[in-house]
């Protein structure tokens, strides 16, 4: 009996050691400089005209549907940028959104076309006037005005592309 238990223990020990070696070898598979994919909750540095701010990116349909729901606050210079692969007329509502927001609508080249106010928990749709919108930026109500940002202000597209690439990284 003792000999049988010792053999089982020895086999389990060998299996554990081999698993540990294989796991250590797999950890070295990443290329130097590789960064993990950034998640939905990651804030990225952005710039609109000369104003620097931080934004989370909503890229996937579920992220766009969730947006800023259930948030009780936002950082003063923090918001959410919605990115669309195909420019479109953009529409938003404020279901389960607890804070008033402003939304800026942008074309594919990063040009701000308009800013609209959205009110907490208001189910009325707020839509862009144009059908060529590629990005929408939600910030605290009054942020655009406080920072003197009006159409045709421009997003810093290299910074935006870097953030989108970090989110889409496979």
Stretches found by the model and what they are:
Residues 4-17:
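Bacterial N-terminal signal peptides that target proteins for export
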């Amino acid at each position: 009996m003792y000999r049988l238990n010792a053999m089982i223990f020895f086999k389990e020990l060998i299996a554990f050691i081999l698993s540990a070696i294989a796991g250590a070898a797999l950890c070295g598979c990443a290329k130097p400089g590789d960064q993990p994919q950034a998640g939905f909750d990651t804030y990225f540095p952005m710039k609109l005209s000369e104003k620097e701010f931080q934004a989370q990116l909503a890229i996937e349909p579920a992220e766009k549907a969730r947006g800023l729901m259930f948030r009780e606050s936002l950082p003063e210079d923090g918001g959410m940028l919605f990115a669309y692969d195909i420019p479109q007329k953009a529409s938003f509502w404020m279901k389960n959104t607890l804070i008033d927001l402003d939304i800026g609508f942008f074309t594919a080249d990063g040009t701000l076309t308009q800013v609209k106010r959205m009110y907490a928990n208001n189910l009325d749709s707020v839509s862009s006037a144009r059908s060529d919108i590629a990005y929408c930026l939600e910030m605290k109500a009054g942020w655009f005005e406080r920072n003197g940002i009006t159409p045709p202000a421009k997003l810093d597209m290299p910074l935006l592309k870097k953030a989108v690439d970090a989110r889409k990284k496979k």
